[in-house]
Amino acid sequence: HEGGMKIDTEVRNVGMKILSNIQDKSFTTVHWTSLLLYKFNEHINRYVNDFKMSNFQCAINDIQILKYTKGGHYKLHCDHGPAVPRTLSLIYFVNEDYEGGDLIFKLINTNNEIKIEKKPNRLIIWPSNFMYPHCVTPVTEGTRYSVVAWAL
């Protein structure tokens, strides 16, 4: 379940721990959540400046740690929707010692796609809108860890 919502494992098969708005008030959890919020917001500000998005304001709404084991995947989707109007999406790659589990962006109105190279300590930021449909291919070996976040 995700926030009381049943997850269809045919669409999304991944272990998840939500960090923001968490009930666990342990010092370690609060510390890591605060550090991630600080770093992600720092990179969002750089992204906004690099793309000259004047008067653009948003803040991290949700942070999740994801664990994809063998067979774990996420079918093609966009992060923005009517229930959660996300503006920017972020993914932080933790490790690379797994096979499969590729982050792929599909270019709309074409058959082309962009496969993001696996690199630990890499942060990818993109607009959450319909122009950036993406998926995670099934993991075939090892375990894929990542941290994802969204800004509203």
Residue ranges, per PLM feature:
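Conserved short histidine dyad/triad with adjacent acidic residue
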Residues: 65-83
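Catalytic core of Fe(II)/2-oxoglutarate
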Residues: 71, 82, 86, 97-152
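Eukaryotic intrinsically disordered and solvent-exposed regulatory patches
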Residues: 51, 77-78, 132-134
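Acidic, glycine-rich loop-and-strand cores that form catalytic or ligand-binding grooves
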Residues: 54-69
